[in-house]
Amino acid sequence: DKEIVLAGNDERGTFYALQTLSRLLKDNQLPAVEIKDYPSIRFRGVVEGFYGTPWSHAARLRQLKFYGENKMNTYIYGPKDDPYHSSPNWRLPYPEKEAEQLQELVKVAKENEVDFVWAIHPGQDIKWNQEDRDNLLAKFEKMYDLGVRSFAVFFDDISGEGTNPVKQAELLNYIDENFVKVKKDVTPLVMCPTEYNKSWSDPKGGYLTTLGDKLNPSIQIMWTGDRVISDITQEGIQWINERIKRPAYIWWNFPVSDYVRDHLLLGPVYGNDTRIA
């Protein structure tokens, strides 16, 4: 007798096994095979973090289905032109329609074994005081009520007092200790630093070293490589990891077209070091 056995390390692994099975089935026939499949990279997915017109709700729903089918486990919501993600309205709750759409995205992400990470971008006008700490936690509570269980804070592409690494670390640790760890079912916090690539960094690593020293160890720190748009190399990973004292959370800017809007960038992938996984 022949049988089909799907086994995964957890519910998500079994879901991925089902995706493999669906691709093997052709004309109601199935080859006699044994497939052992596992990821070499922990976080696999997409950041919607570009400038310009954000994706439509329908496009995001299609994307989440695509991620599940292709065993991608992370979608980070952070479109720069969403005013409730960034300035001027990051302190305010989403209007009813947008809140309902986000709630649906969280639901569909879960159905496709994708972690929906909601990001906030407060750095351009944040005040380093208790009032804005409370504002940020209140916004996170609103998103938690919509079903979000993964969160990120972006300090990229800002200027002024918001770039202070000591203040950033104090705020992030406060969120970590008063929200993330309190909730029990929220995944580790992710942050995008102001100096998110090597070419923009202090050669001595002052900003990055401060984050590495002061941020709670569980907080993930994003990194785009030697430049904004860059190959990811083993040497580059070693450089950043030494400074932030944890494995970098790679935000690979490919394909990024918000600076070239008259055509699509669809070239092949090359240049990334296969040893970085």
Predicted regions and their residues:
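Catalytic-core regions of glycoside hydrolase
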Residues: F50, K139, I158-A277
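Acidic-enriched, low-complexity/disordered segments with a strong bias for Aspartate over Glutamate
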Residues: D1, D10, D27, D37, ...
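Feature activates predominantly on carbohydrate-active enzymes
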Residues: K2-D132, L136-K139, D145-R149
